[in-house]
Amino acid sequence: MDYLDYFDIVDGKLLFSGGNISELSEKYGTPLIIYSRRIIERNVRELMNAFDKENFSLHYAMKANYNPAILSILRNKGVGIDAANLNEVLLALQTGFSKDKIIASPNNLPGNELKNIKETGVTINFDDISQFNMVAADPPETVSFRINPGIGKGEFEGTTTGGKGSKFGMPPEAALKAYETAIESGVHRFGIHMMTGSNVLDPEFFRESTRTFFSIASGISHKLGITFEFVDIGGGFGVPYRDNEESLDLGRTSNYIKENMKNYRDLFTENTKLIIEPGRYIVANSAVLISRVTCKKDYDRIMIGTDTGMNILIRPALYGAIHPIIPVNKFFNKKEERGDVVGPICENTDKIAKDISIQKLEPGDLIAILNAGAYVTSMSSNYNLQPKAMEILLDNREEYIIRERDELQDMLNNFIIPEHLKAIGMDRL
């Protein structure tokens, strides 16, 4: 994988999507997440072109990154939304997505939240019959259930969302009963859904999983005499994070899926829509996280201290995930060293990278952490009262702030001290 596809070097300066990283870091400070609208739109275009235009819908899994500016870019390109809960549905509506472009796929929600989602008019992929039963007295017009086809794949155990032991979806026999219950509740319009993995780079997995899923869906359709208005195969389209990984062959992947669709013509009527729900594939490589080296230790091993902690990038600590790191101002430095890249959080797990080889860095140097567009800001926190990163968007030679850096008061706004506990003269936190 060539990580430098999105970078240029002009007059010795490292540019990302046309933006001078050093200059932007000086202007806005670090940690700084820099997004490229051009890359987001190119990723959307690749997905759109890989599938037939008719009876196909691309929905973005907004859990990957819910920044409203990113959502607005996708809305303008005709992309729909895959939402995981009521707040995601409401944000999608607030950013201009019509209800018919939003599908909610919640998991283990309380009844009042499910009812509120239903009241918005968006389509719901019910994770279980128990979830549907919460609204069965007044069911939505269209009902879809999430199937666990017994197949799952993920970069890590925690990101595998199908197969044995997964908390998501229903086995085929339970799904059949769920659709029977929906019919008995007066429902006449149906969809069907699965989501089995995350960051999958092997086209063969999509071949196997969709073949199995289509077979299950076809069986339900035949046994109950129903047709599906949409068949939603979820996401899982991966991007490489390691040097030895190849990019997902999207053409081969889509051909496998379309081949399976042809083999199940009874399932895919002329009015049946295929839906995919990628998140990472659309936004991961659209952003870099810029961090500044703050200090350096060289005792039993080299520790490169930075101003980016696990509160901003949790994936390495949570999953053992790897994010490629390149030096910004030492790009041509021939001297390399091995060490850990660490942050300012009071945890020994606060390591952005372990035992990596990188050009020799000193305090004040900048590094770029790649694939920062997905599951970075959406999983960030204010642990240790550390601020989340500022975010900017590069758009047609202009730059826009799309998230301000946290100030202390921003992090304290929802806390309330009872009057009798306040310090003398204290009027606010």
Whereabouts are the PLM-identified features?
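Active-site loop/helix belt of alpha/beta enzymes
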Residues: 2-3, 149-294, 358
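Charged (often Lys/Glu-rich) extended helix/loop segments that serve as interaction or gating elements
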Residues: 25, 271-429
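Glycine-rich, aromatic-flanked loop segments that form ligand/cofactor-binding clefts
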Residues: 140-152
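Structural recognition of alpha->loop->beta junctions
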Residues: 74-81, 171-178, 220, 299-300
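Conserved, mostly hydrophobic/aromatic
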Residues: 40, 63, 85, 117, ...
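A charged N-terminal "starter" segment
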Residues: 1-141, 182-184, 188, 222, ...
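Active-site-proximal loop/turn and secondary-structure-junction residues that shape catalytic pockets
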Residues: 64-66, 87-88, 108-110, 128-130, ...
